[in-house]
Amino acid sequence: MQVSLRWLKDYVDIDLTPAEVSDRLTMAGLEVDAVREVGPSFSNVVVARIIALRRHPNADKLSLCEVTTGDETLPIVCGAPNIHVGDVVPLARIGAEIPGGYTIKRSKIRGELSEGMLCSEEELGIGEDTTGVMILPPNLPLGEDLADVLDLKDTVFDIGITPNRSDCLSIIGVAREIAAITGKPLKLPEIYVTENAEDIQVSASVQILDPDLCPHYTARMIRDVVVGPSPQWMRLRLEAVGLRSISNVVDVTNFVMMELGQPLHAFDYRFLEEGRIVVRRSTEGEKFISLDEKERVLNANTLMICDGVKPVAIAGIMGGFNSEIKPDTRDILLESAYFAPSSIRRSARDLGMSTDAAFRFERGIDPEGVLRALDRAAQLIAELSGGKICKGRIDEHPKPVETVGEIHLRCRKVNSLLGTNIPAAEMADILRGLGMEVTAKEGTVEEYRIKPPSFRVDIGREIDLVEEIARIHGYDNIPVSLPVGAMEPVPRDRRKILEERLRRHLAGTGFSEVITYSFVSPTAADILALDAGDERRKVVRIKNPLTEDQSVMRTTLIYSLLKVMQENANAGDYDLKIFEIGKIFLQGNTGGLPTEKKRLACLMTGMSDKELWSSGESRLDFYDLKGVVESLFASLNLTGIRYCSDALQAFLHPGRSCGIFIDEKSIGYMGEAHPDVLSRLDMKNRALIFEMDVDAISELFSGSVTYKEFSRYPESSRDVAFVIDQDVEADGMLNIALNAREELLENVCIFDVYAGAGVPEGKKSLGLRFTYRSYSATLTDDEVSRVHSKIVQRIIDQTGARVR
């Protein structure tokens, strides 16, 4: 948000330099991103008075002027029709620079010498009036720099307002912070309304059909306005904060929004059918042309401001083209309302619209500031346009807006948390300076009852008050001290150790950790094609989601990683190896509280070793993923791992996926993402993913490392090719061998899989390599053969295999 220093000084006395203001605001929690000096885009323009005026002898439309700056008199040739002797005007002297890259030079115009130029507002870049020379107030000192006497120079702070501090989305909100920091009083504008037209009830009415989305709507009628340019002081204020001047009526609504933080809207009354305002939801597919002349197609959830026949504004976002203020507007209906933040946030997102009004409404405005802003705007419009304010105002509030009640503050608790010795009286003064009501609690020492102001929607607990006291007292005023007390070593949590080991191993194998939102789209289950009875379809819904795409809690990490892959692919990055350790949230069938479970998920996509000199490019496949899983378990010293192709997931390729088990306990699944899932996300590249239950793994993980002596004697290997049915899993044969519990068997692994010529149809050849080793002596051939024969026979007996 852009904040003008000169505007701030209207409400609080500031004797700090801009740099000091920036530092104090930042230390109080309002981070100033930049400080900019702004001013007019002209130089060497001074105040002068016309002392003589006559017609140019060689041109009918030009005049010869003599102007004085107090120190000298200069001849000027001018073509403006609005100047007279005695007028005080801006004079661009020789060498002056004005907008457009022009430099004023001494010249002869139709034979007459001109030593400068008399300027219009438009030529100086401080207004849009091009009808003639800018006429200045007669009391301005001659010869003085125009930028100085008109206060055209300013300092603008770019402040990053956090979402919880909507009260600071106004000049007065920031001024209140400065007043609290410096101890200076806050000077609020005096608001007075002179009602000198008929009663508003005669001409207008308001009906709210959806009080949940619009609990408060107020309006005033102003007759006989004259729409025209705003005065210079208002144009300068608006331009300093990045707003363009449009007309006096529209500028007032923007001025009050920036001043008080309450968005307003002015309707041309003649275009309001039946003189009515109806606040309702739109109908599905309803069309509306907004002020930017774009046609919007609405859904059934958009709150609209309508007249007796048609919609005239999108509530809290933008007005309609059909009721905008025009140069010939004479009567206006002025709106000030409170709209539900979630409604405005949803509508702005659905329509792809971002406006200053929506930005404030969706963060929460002051519910008690609606009438104040209405009267302030009516006052200014009447003053600047000559309009007459109708008697009374429409004030519909069918549903009260909830505000925070009293909060109990314990001063000792504050000092205990902060490590300070702030006196209770100082705490009370700090909170009063922030607009809070402070009442001492009867019969207690250093305890208060605090009533937060309605504009502080972020304060609801005692700890919030502690934060307010800390930041205004000054974080740099909190003493630094070391904790005192006996500290005993705390045993490390086994699951924390596990998570550290997982992160370290995956990072070491080229994976990058990502942290994604726990909130996902309700369509995630459909995109993943989860079965109707899958518990992951029972989602936990969020009451006030930021967006519809983040309205439910995730039940798997897979969708989140696929979205990361999608975003990277859209940015042109197709080679990706990522992982996440995070929580999922399951609703369950009992209807009670949801359960949280910790999961590990990995995703790989793209090319494998594409820079390897000895081979061409190859895409990552299922076996690359399986290698990652096996190395992960090896790093954790977990054994008994087996893979089962029966435990399939709907979002995985049925022929390239499997479940992961340790002994008989299911701990996850892995495989290639189903092509249909990738198609729903508009992705074509293969994605290899696995997800594991960290909680289940932690039960099997010891957290300690066991060392044993390695064998000093050589190994002996035997290769055997078995012919087995196609549906027999290799993992089962490996487990049969390992479960034989033969002491000499060190390892067994697959070295070949073949199906084709020489192997009967429906069969496959599976080559296994058996490794034998003793810790006491070199094995003889007979010793190896005896054990090897028993293991091979065990495999044959249990699988029906035959040796090829």
UniProtKB/Swiss-Prot annotation:
Cofactor: how bound: Binds 2 magnesium ions per tetramer.
Subcellular compartments: Cytoplasm
Reaction(s) this enzyme catalyzes, per UniProt: tRNA(Phe) + L-phenylalanine + ATP = L-phenylalanyl-tRNA(Phe) + AMP + diphosphate + H(+)
Domain (tRNA-binding): residue spans on this chain: 39-147
Chain ranges of the FDX-ACB domain: 711-804
Gene Ontology MF annotations: ATP binding; magnesium ion binding; phenylalanine-tRNA ligase activity; tRNA binding
Binding site for Mg(2+): D458, D464, E467, E468
Disulfide links within the chain: none
Keywords carried by this UniProt record: Aminoacyl-tRNA synthetase, ATP-binding, Cytoplasm, Ligase, Magnesium, Metal-binding, Nucleotide-binding, Protein biosynthesis, RNA-binding, tRNA-binding
Top-rank taxon, per record: Bacteria
SMART domains noted in UniProt: B3_4, B5, FDX-ACB
E.C. numbers: 6.1.1.20
CDD domains given in the database record: PheRS_beta_core, tRNA_bind_bactPheRS
Cofactor annotation: Mg(2+)
Matches recorded under InterPro entries: aa-tRNA-synth_II/BPL/LPL, B3/B4_tRNA-bd, DNA-bd_dom_put_sf, Fdx_antiC-bd, Fdx_antiC-bd_sf, NA-bd_OB-fold, Phe-tRNA-ligase_IIc_bsu, Phe-tRNA-ligase_IIc_bsu_bact
Domain spans labelled B5: 402-480
Cellular component terms per the entry's GO annotation: phenylalanine-tRNA ligase complex
UniProt GO BP: phenylalanyl-tRNA aminoacylation
Self-association state and partner proteins as the record states: Tetramer of two alpha and two beta subunits.
Family stated for the protein in its record: Belongs to the phenylalanyl-tRNA synthetase beta subunit family. Type 1 subfamily.
Protein name: Phenylalanine--tRNA ligase beta subunit
Protein species of origin: Syntrophus aciditrophicus (strain SB)
Lineage: Bacteria, Pseudomonadati, Thermodesulfobacteriota, Syntrophia, Syntrophales
